[in-house]
């Protein structure tokens, strides 16, 4: 089968012909129809320090997908051939304390599809049935291909009560933009998103934010004043991993505010702890998606009218994957889809 493989310990990804994966009694085999390129895939392509320490070579990469079931293991129940599916990309152990307590997103032994085990940038993917998400007919193929990052956005956006609250989002990448759409959909008052990339700020405007702010040219305090905000932001969603953005968020928060951290800053990032302590801020780290409550909520939001399609800006046949990766890495795109 056709597959995109991290075949060498150097920058690049290569298209290769490899065998169709075997599947076990508790697995399903999925015919891949569409995949989406993630920032993680860009790290793997560029072969940065994180990728060198993490990715086995050779290995098929990719973890965001839509497909149809073509084979079902003999012990699998509740799934059948022909079903439209996506899937949870974190494979958990099932035996650690958090897994046994129903908090599988906190499994200490998680393996990532396309990171620690073969991924979905291929014509077929074998996946444990427990990780497969059957989809209703009114979820489009393009939406289904980006449910994984949409789930990151939903997990972060739903971490705290945002109904009637003023929300600050730092980082207008695809996940930050989708988080903005979510909090607006569920009833936030003012939604402000910041970045230094005008292209992505314009995408955020299309998703209905109150203000999309290029912090190179405008100060948050001025935006808050324009919106009539007197006491700072109630909820912060940090998506950028940028140390300056993180500290700007802390300064902009109201006393008693809540901050969810999804972006990954450098390890030695300093924080002004006076902002945290004297304001009584609550900070929560966000990783992946809650299994599987986040999945139920994000599908329900799509069915109830939330439109995330504007964040999808490019579609390419898989044979043009090199150009697709260049577009994604340029920062001049939203989500980029590969059609199989």
UniProtKB/Swiss-Prot annotation:
Residues binding Zn(2+) 1: 38, 63-64
Residues carrying the site annotation Important for catalytic activity for the proton relay mechanism but does not participate directly in the coordination of zinc atom: 148
Binding-site residues for NAD(+), renumbered to this chain: 175, 195, 200, 262-264, 286-287
Cofactors required: Zn(2+)
Pathway listed: Amino-acid degradation; L-threonine degradation via oxydo-reductase pathway; glycine from L-threonine: step 1/2
Keyword Cytoplasm among UniProt keywords: yes
Xref: SUPFAM superfamilies: GroES-like, NAD(P)-binding Rossmann-fold domains
Subcellular location, record wording: Cytoplasm
Pfam families: ADH_N, ADH_zinc_N
Top-level EC class: oxidoreductase
Residue numbers binding Zn(2+) 2: 93, 96, 99, 107
Entry GO MF terms: L-threonine 3-dehydrogenase activity; zinc ion binding
GO biological process, one term: L-threonine catabolic process to glycine
Chain's role: Catalyzes the NAD(+)-dependent oxidation of L-threonine to 2-amino-3-ketobutyrate.
Family per similarity comment: Belongs to the zinc-containing alcohol dehydrogenase family.
Name by which UniProt lists this protein: L-threonine 3-dehydrogenase
UniProt organism field: Legionella pneumophila (strain Paris)
